[in-house]
């Protein structure tokens, strides 16, 4: 199994030129040969086909591949001024041109919708994307999102599997996010077994799980790397054994925010805002995410799965 790394965390490094060659080059220096490519609205302007061709060339030059991508997050049921269908059609075409075989497209939600309404609307939404997926032959991945306190109902493996089964199309499969699942107190092994042959991709990251709501922050989608704290509670033995038992074919893809911008309030001293330590340096970022690669290699090696 190959290790992969989502490319979006470099967006948080100040004054770093965010072109594909720079961003993917840094990820490659950390050891990764695969990336989960983050498609933004800026990618999907009138030049999106040229951008996709450039990405494909950069990946080839670096000896990398992008087995999966993430489309812009737009709520199809409350899109504002955005043409969500145009965004998703372009995202699928972008992937085809760039050589990316599958892309995460999030479900939508409306405040106070019931589970029945949520499923009815989202099954119809995903089915409306079938022609756009079939034309380039790119898979759409449904990701687990939400918790008991919000309007999403893709909390558990059974929920996401039900959604994929209701859409009922071979190009519509599942990306399991370990951190999101951990916030909902999921048995990870049982979850992976439930997802079974529909599980085609991962977002691997950690957090401290669920606390009772009396805590100020009882769920925090932290996106930390494994072993970052003694309280991190994703069980990677359960994850990897589940992947083995279902014959998982995808990458072990990290979606971590390790050594990134702090969201703490600004510090003011003598009337001036001080930001000297708000961001890490690029060198610190590289060292930290080289460690992420090494951790992933250690995990996969322990099960005889690592593929360089």
Predicted regions, residues:
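Histidine-acidic metal/acid-base catalytic patches
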Residues: 1-9, 17-31, 99, 157-176, ...
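Conserved beta-strand positions in the central sheet of alpha/beta enzyme cores
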Residues: 36, 68, 104, 141, ...
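Active-site mouth loops of central-metabolism enzymes
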Residues: 2-19, 74-85, 112-118
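Glycine-rich, proline-tolerant flexible connector loops at the mouths of alpha/beta enzymes
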Residues: 36-59, 109-113
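Active-site-proximal loop/turn and secondary-structure-junction residues that shape catalytic pockets
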Residues: 9-11, 39-41, 72-75, 107-111, ...
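Residue-level detector of anion-binding/catalytic polar loops
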Residues: 33-34, 65, 101, 139, ...
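Active-site acidic/histidine proton-transfer and metal-coordination neighborhood
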Residues: 58-61, 77-174, 265-266, 279, ...
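The substrate-binding groove and active-site-proximal loops of carbohydrate-active enzymes
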Residues: 73-81, 116, 179, 223-230
């Amino acid at each position: 199994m190959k290790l992969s790394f989502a490319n979006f965390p470099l967006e948080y490094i100040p004054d770093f030129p965010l072109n594909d060659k720079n961003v993917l080059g840094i990820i490659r220096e950390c050891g990764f040969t695969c990336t989960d490519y983050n498609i933004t609205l800026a990618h999907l302007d009138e030049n999106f086909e040229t951008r996709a061709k450039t990405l494909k060339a950069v990946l080839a030059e670096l000896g990398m591949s992008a087995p999966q991508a993430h489309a812009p997050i737009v709520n199809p049921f409350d899109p504002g001024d955005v043409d969500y269908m145009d965004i998703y059609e372009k995202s699928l075409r972008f992937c085809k041109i760039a050589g990316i075989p599958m892309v995460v497209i999030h479900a939508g939600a409306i405040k106070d919708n019931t589970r029945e309404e949520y499923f009815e609307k989202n099954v119809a939404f995903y089915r409306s994307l079938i022609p756009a997926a079939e034309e380039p032959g790119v898979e759409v991945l449904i990701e687990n999102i939400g918790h008991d306190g919000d309007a999403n109902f893709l909390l558990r493996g059974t929920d996401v599997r039900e959604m994929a089964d209701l859409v009922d199309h071979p190009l519509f499969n599942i990306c399991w996010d370990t951190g999101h699942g951990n916030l909902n107190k999921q048995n990870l092994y049982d979850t992976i077994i439930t997802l079974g042959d529909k599980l085609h991709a991962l977002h691997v990251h950690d957090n401290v799980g669920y606390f009772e709501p009396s805590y100020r922050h009882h769920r925090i989608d932290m996106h930390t790397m494994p072993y970052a704290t003694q309280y991190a509670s994703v069980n990677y033995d359960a994850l990897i054994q589940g992947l083995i038992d279902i014959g998982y074919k995808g990458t072990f893809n990290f979606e971590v925010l390790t050594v990134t911008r702090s969201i703490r309030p600004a510090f003011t001293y003598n009337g001036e805002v001080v930001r000297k330590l708000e961001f890490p340096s690029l060198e610190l970022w590289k060292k930290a995410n080289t460690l992420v690669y090494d951790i992933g290699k250690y995990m996969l090696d322990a099960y005889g799965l690592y593929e360089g």
